[in-house]
Amino acid sequence: MSESPKKVIVGMSGGVDSSVSAWLLQQQGYQVEGLFMKNWEEDDGEEYCTAAADLADAQAVCDKLGIELHTVNFAAEYWDNVFELFLEEYKAGRTPNPDILCNKEIKFKAFLEFAAEDLGADYIATGHYVRRADVNGKSRLLRGLDGNKDQSYFLYTLGHEQIAQSLFPVGELEKPQVRKIAEDLGLVTAKKKDSTGICFIGERKFRDFLGRYLPAQPGKIITVDGDEIGEHQGLMYHTLGQRKGLGIGGTKDGTEDPWYVVDKDVENNVLIVAQGHEHPRLMSVGLIAQQLHWVDREPFTGTLRCTVKTRYRQTDIPCTINALDDDRIEVIFDEPVAAVTPGQSAVFYSGEVCLGGGIIEQRLPLTV
């Protein structure tokens, strides 16, 4: 008697990657069902229309593939475990990455638990561009085969136990191949553009959105030499290395370097700027990271040579990690790096393998 196929619940977002993931798993012999997660309570017409369209696309794909689509509302979990922390970080003058938190708390926690306990799933699957490999009895997280779309940076908080319960079908493909499969299958999502913006909140004017929840506090813009040259509308709207949207204009004759944000004085509500994207005040020789997550779930001790990304799509930076007390590490770069931003994540790699990462607590500036 043959064994019944393993059941996989695919997180269906209404996008092309999850659509093709569902089909690929069908081809591999799994019993596939979809789950559409509603993680945000829309409060205006535009938001509602986007969410409704995504659900309709997910349903159309599932109908085409002949699979059942479940829906679940995780809006309360998202608000409590992602959004409130996101606002707290902005209030503190840091720049958080909500997509990482959303993966940790929603997609690979709330969704994983719901799929296993309520839907009887053996695995969950998502349309992330990452791969998994089993080494010495532990599942490892690998970069996606398409280096341009690799999303391992956003999944570093996952432990080997979660990865063992997760499948990433498109991680073995390149994006154009995924779109070609969707076109050949006649899926409505084939030409749908990739979503951008905050995880589950979608594409909207970020400044307007943030302003709904946090009151703006205007303050001075000063240069590194102490000259006041303008006014900002709120530190939360600015991040290190930012050039656009400062409202201080360019240089008079257009020959000098443009202004960049090099620091935020949260205590005094002052934005500090300098000219040139390689200004010494913008450069860091390293960083201190906290809230560490290692994929193998082993505590880190001692010293390690590896590479690090301090933001998504950044070229890997060779570095040395030194363990500090209290679950913190010091990271020293081989060469100075621009715009290392507190609140963002530092993610570590050994070749193709994502080792884990942590939140940047502070940068170690090139100049003090």
Swiss-Prot record:
Reaction(s) catalysed (UniProt annotation): S-sulfanyl-L-cysteinyl-[protein] + uridine(34) in tRNA + AH2 + ATP = 2-thiouridine(34) in tRNA + L-cysteinyl-[protein] + A + AMP + diphosphate + H(+)
Enzyme Commission (EC) number: 2.8.1.13
Any single GO BP term: tRNA wobble position uridine thiolation
Keyword Metal-binding: no
GO CC annotation terms, alphabetical: cytoplasm
Annotated binding of ATP, by residue: 11-18, 37, 127
InterPro entries for this protein: MnmA-like, MnmA-like_C, MnmA-like_central, MnmA-like_central_sf, Rossmann-like_a/b/a_fold
Site feature: Interaction with tRNA: 128, 344
Top-level division of the source organism's lineage: Bacteria
Segments for region (Interaction with target base in tRNA): 97-99
Intracellular or extracellular location(s): Cytoplasm
Pfam families: tRNA_Me_trans, tRNA_Me_trans_C, tRNA_Me_trans_M
SUPFAM superfamilies per record: Adenine nucleotide alpha hydrolases-like
Active site: 102, 199
The protein's assembly and partners: Interacts with TusE.
Function: Catalyzes the 2-thiolation of uridine at the wobble position (U34) of tRNA(Lys), tRNA(Glu) and tRNA(Gln), leading to the formation of s(2)U34, the first step of tRNA-mnm(5)s(2)U34 synthesis. Sulfur is provided by IscS, via a sulfur-relay system. Binds ATP and its substrate tRNAs.
The family this protein is said to belong to: Belongs to the MnmA/TRMU family.
The protein's name: tRNA-specific 2-thiouridylase MnmA
Gene: mnmA
